[in-house]
């Protein structure tokens, strides 16, 4: 990660939306980090799109107005959700994977990349997961490993400058882990209590 954060600085999060994105993949971290910010944890959260600002149609038909194009140079954390992985011709992650210009820009991003579910496959296509511990949705694990990642069977995998989450609902655990990692376990527990949610699975951390 190419930045040094003072404790007084807000953690600037951008969540990338695109046509075909899985609703749960991005809603969970937006909810968790937005709540953390309101509780004084120092997170700011922004929805962004790789194209011009406008309406994104999600996997299950939800339409979201995204007011911002992505500006990764202004982010400390870039969250890439998944969606549409099983349909290689429709909207979803495969359109991002096919966009070589986007992948080149993504590969050069200095913000901490965070992949949720099959959004990890977008990071993989950009070469970010190659040779590194990572996880993804169960249906994509074999391909992730074939593309050079070191597959870890954990809910959240934190390799310091790369974080990945496995499964559609893993965005909850990933986001709560981000709160814990950046502002402490006590603050993460406060958010968890307000959400009335109990984290599941394990967090694997590189030594």
Where does each model-flagged region fall?
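Extended, subdomain-level signal for the structured scaffold at the beginning of enzyme domains
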Residues: 1-113, 121-125, 141-145, 150-153, ...
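Small/polar loops that bind or transfer phosphate-bearing groups
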Residues: 17, 136, 166
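Conserved beta-strand segments that form the floor/walls of ligand-binding pockets within enzyme
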Residues: 79, 135, 157
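Structural detector of well-ordered beta-strand residues that form the stable sheet scaffold
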Residues: 113-114, 135, 152, 163
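Short hydrophobic/aromatic-enriched beta-strand-loop microsegments
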Residues: 130-138, 151-154
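Amphipathic alpha-helical segments enriched in hydrophobic/aromatic residues interleaved with Lys/Arg
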Residues: 154-164, 168
């Amino acid at each position: 990660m190419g930045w040094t954060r003072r404790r007084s600085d807000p953690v600037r999060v951008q969540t990338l939306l695109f046509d075909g994105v899985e609703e749960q993949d991005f809603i969970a971290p937006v909810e968790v980090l937005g709540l953390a910010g309101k509780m004084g944890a120092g997170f700011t959260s922004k929805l962004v799109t790789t194209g011009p600002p406008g309406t994104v149609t999600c996997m299950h038909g939800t339409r979201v107005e995204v007011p911002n194009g992505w500006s990764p140079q202004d982010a400390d954390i870039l969250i890439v959700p998944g969606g549409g992985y099983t349909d290689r011709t429709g909207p979803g992650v495969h359109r991002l994977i096919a966009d070589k210009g986007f992948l080149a820009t993504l590969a050069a991003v200095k913000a901490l990349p965070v992949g949720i579910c099959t959004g990890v496959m977008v990071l993989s296509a950009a070469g970010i997961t190659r040779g590194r511990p990572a996880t993804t949705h169960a249906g994509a694990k074999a391909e992730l490993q074939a593309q050079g990642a070191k597959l870890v069977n954990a809910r959240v995998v934190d390799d310091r400058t790369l974080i990945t989450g496995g499964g559609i609902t893993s965005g909850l655990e990933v986001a709560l882990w981000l709160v814990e990692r950046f502002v402490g376990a006590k603050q993460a527990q406060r958010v968890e209590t307000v959400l009335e949610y109990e984290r599941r699975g394990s967090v694997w951390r590189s030594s």
